């Protein structure tokens, strides 16, 4: 009888304590989570880092330092003219670089630094300039870029990855590289493809 009485008393005590314990647990589970540093947004990139990342995104092992400068001027122009035209995979930031690109990222930084105040302009306006890796020996006009003219790009035929069906509007990066390796400055190479443009200091 004594044992039954103890069991009943314990049952009453547990019945009284259980709702309190449940409410404490539920308070914990609905508490606001703490924000870890991994949840905080990344520090915004400055314009120099963005230009480096865009230049690195177009890099090839064969490119000369002068070619990198030409690409940096082109990327600077396009980013200023239409920043929304770029996708996430167009950017290669230093912390994500690997292999040969990581080894030359210092050169890419130099090219970007030398180009950060230069833009391609037509009638004093920075306009988006389309580009391709290579052409089939000539660049084409396009209805979307009426300010771009067709020019000869015969040196693209010397490329090991030459494609007779490639259609390039604007600038051929392989052509720029050929011109830069054969005595042209970055500015001269760009203006070959864009004869109606000028390179202005911002």
Ranges and model annotations:
Residues 1-202:
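Conserved, single-site charged/polar hotspot
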């Amino acid at each position: 009888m004594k044992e039954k009485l103890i069991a009943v008393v314990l049952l009453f005590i547990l019945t009284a304590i259980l709702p309190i314990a449940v409410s404490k647990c539920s308070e914990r589970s609905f508490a606001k989570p703490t924000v870890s540093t991994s949840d905080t947004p990344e520090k915004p990139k400055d314009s120099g880092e963005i230009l480096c990342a865009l230049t690195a995104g177009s890099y090839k092992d064969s490119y000369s330092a002068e070619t990198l400068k030409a690409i940096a001027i082109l990327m600077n122009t396009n980013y200023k003219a239409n920043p929304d035209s770029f996708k996430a995979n167009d950017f290669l930031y230093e912390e994500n670089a690997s292999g040969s690109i990581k080894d030359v990222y210092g050169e890419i930084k130099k090219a970007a630094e030398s180009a950060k105040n230069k833009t391609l302009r037509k009638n004093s306006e920075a306009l988006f300039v389309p580009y391709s890796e290579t052409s089939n020996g000539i660049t084409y006009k396009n209805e979307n870029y009426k300010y771009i003219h067709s020019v000869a790009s015969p040196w693209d035929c010397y490329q090991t990855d030459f494609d007779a069906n490639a259609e390039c509007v604007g600038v051929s990066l392989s052509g720029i590289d050929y011109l830069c390796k054969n005595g042209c400055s970055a500015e001269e190479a760009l203006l070959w493809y864009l004869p109606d443009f000028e390179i202005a200091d911002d």
